[in-house]
Amino acid sequence: MTLARHVIDRCNLTILLEPGHEDLAEFLSRHEVEIIASLPCYSARNVNEQRGDGVFDASIRALQLLNRLGYGSDGRLPLHLVYNPNGTFLPGPQAELEADYKAELQQHFGIVFNRLYTITNMPIARFEGHLRHHGQYDAYMDLLLRSFNPANVNGLMCRNTLNIGWRGEVYDCDFNQMLDLQWRDGGPRYLWDIDPAQVEGRAILTGDHCFGCTAGCGSSCGGALAAP
């Protein structure tokens, strides 16, 4: 029996191999849950530098497990990967990166997947701390501002998607949740406080980080927003 809703799991690949979670991949496949998983590069060195030693090998084994269950080849089990740059630059063209990923992962590991989504590094949280520590914050923000692309604005995920926290908090996007920019009308707003009829036309809470989604080809949970 499958779930009655289209469910997407923003999956940490390595958790699929952790003790106590051995049945998670099979559970997701049985319920036809779409998987979107981060793999910052198809190179072991780059992934391990960004995520820690051993993460690349564990991610590859997890992807091979998902492939054995039908993910990436069975139309009912979509498997998408997410790329974000390992540095202070914008993602390259999504279609070209997807072709490279598919060729490299198939050739070296026999892995197949459906789509690759490119996401810009947002100047918040740990990445903001890294930028400030190395004196690169102002230069990176200047890059985002200079790369503003008005063609991305209509497709911004904050204009058609809500983010709901685990306690019911309502945010305009994932990044606003990380910054605790919760909806407020005299106080915090929760999912059960919201009248759907009042959502359309509501002002979106914005900040400097929003230029990350409008730069270059754009960025969203579904990848690039505009053609290169």
Regions found by a protein language model. Give the residues of each.
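Core AdoMet radical
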Residues: M1-G20, F27-L63, H80
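A generic local structural motif
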Residues: G20-L24, A197-V199
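Short secondary-structure boundary/capping segments
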Residues: E26-F27, N154, R202
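Radical SAM enzyme [4Fe-4S]-AdoMet core and its adjacent flexible, acidic
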Residues: S43-M157
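C-terminal accessory regions of radical SAM enzymes
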Residues: L145-N176
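Flexible mid-to-C-terminal extensions adjoining Fe-S/redox cofactors in radical SAM and related proteins
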Residues: E169-P228
